[in-house]
Amino acid sequence: MKIVVSDCDHASMRIEEKVLADAGFGYEHHACRTEDDLIAKCAGANVIMTQYGPFSDRVLAALCPDLGLIVRYGVGVDTIDLDAATRLGVQICNVPDYGMNEVSDHALGLMLALVRKIPMITNSTRAGEWDYRMSIPVRRIKDMTIGVLGVGRIGRLFALKAMAFGGRVVLCDPYKPDGKSRVPGAEQLPFDDFIAAADVVSVHCPLSEETNGLIGAPEIARMRPGAFIINTARGGIVDEDALAEGLASGKLAGAGIDTVEVEPLRKDSPLRALDTCLVTPHMAWYSEESANELKRKVAEEAVRFAQGHCVTYPVNRPA
């Protein structure tokens, strides 16, 4: 059984190495970034553990029939051609239940920092000012409607935390638009009503054909004046040009983003120059505990497959 880590930028592989070694397996570790890298370095692999590798139809076809499993370090699997993997008999797995508290906390932190204007007033104080009026206007969070777009594990957790402020929380699930509320005390709305009602839209849905560009210029135009957008999910869900325009025009009061369409955020992005936009470098998932959990679960999934057991986190059903 050949197990390969195609790419991983973590500082240490100690946890994976121990999990694999305890089960009697070794592994190869590469730094593949391109399709050609994957084809050359992962040839003959039965199991691949990957972080960012672009597993296109071409790559998967070249690695089959040896390849049986790809496990991704993370939740999203948009770097993998799922249709091709399913057709070619490759099992795809992710780790959907790690870092849930971290991501929901990060989204909540971005929201609080923006609504309370903490970065702005901190910069003012550092510049020698001492005047709360520099932050005017600031709204009371309890009187705001907090919207949660995507009601999976992280979205539900964010909604529960947001409800602690005592205000209205509304939900919208792009995959279950007519479903009942999955969070007691929160109201489920159709997308158009949701966009028009929310003072804060916190994005927690996966990136897919259905959600790519889900929030663009038309949607921002229908939002409440002075609304906020928080995105700790995937960059492509929110149109960055439309977001920048909404912030620059004052239609939006602020945005907090942890993911962008192309990472890292390009140096000439207008979002970098906007004081009302808080940008973090795709770190919402991170804490020491969540990083260790992720590494352990990826390696454990690889071991399960290698030993002929059922996987715990299947994303597809291979042919």
Question: Where do the protein language model's features map onto the residues?
Answer:
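Rossmann-like dinucleotide-binding domain for NAD(H)/NADP(H)
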Residues: L88, I92, G226-A319
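Short beta->alpha connector loops at strand-helix junctions that form conserved
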Residues: H30-A31, Y73-G74, V90-N101, D192, ...
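Phosphate-coordination loops involved in phosphoryl transfer and adenosine-cofactor binding
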Residues: L67, K142-T145, A217, G226
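Short, Asp-centered acidic motifs that coordinate Mg2+ and/or phosphate
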Residues: N46-V47, L69, V200, F228, ...
